[in-house]
Amino acid sequence: MIRTTFNKLREVKDSLPHGSMDAIAAELNIAADDVRDFFSGASKMDGYHLEAGPDGGIVVLENSAILDVALRLAWAAKNAL
């Protein structure tokens, strides 16, 4: 289980290169809208819990697959791999 803040998720989203939402969706075999919803706080996915708190709220993720792929893509873009 991963705990982070909504603002941290937005930072990850903002660091992703163009087309990443579709790339994440394709890799995980899910809809691109589900990936967009994940980063917008509108996610209805099981295991995504948003609570009031600092930095836009506390997000608890039971499944971090979208975040894991996003962090890998952001790291690769930052390091030009």
Model-derived features: positions:
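Short, amphipathic alpha-helical "recognition" segments used to contact nucleic acids or chromatin
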Residues: 2-19
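DNA major-groove recognition helix of helix-turn-helix
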Residues: 39
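Key DNA-contact positions within bacterial/archaeal DNA-binding proteins
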Residues: 33
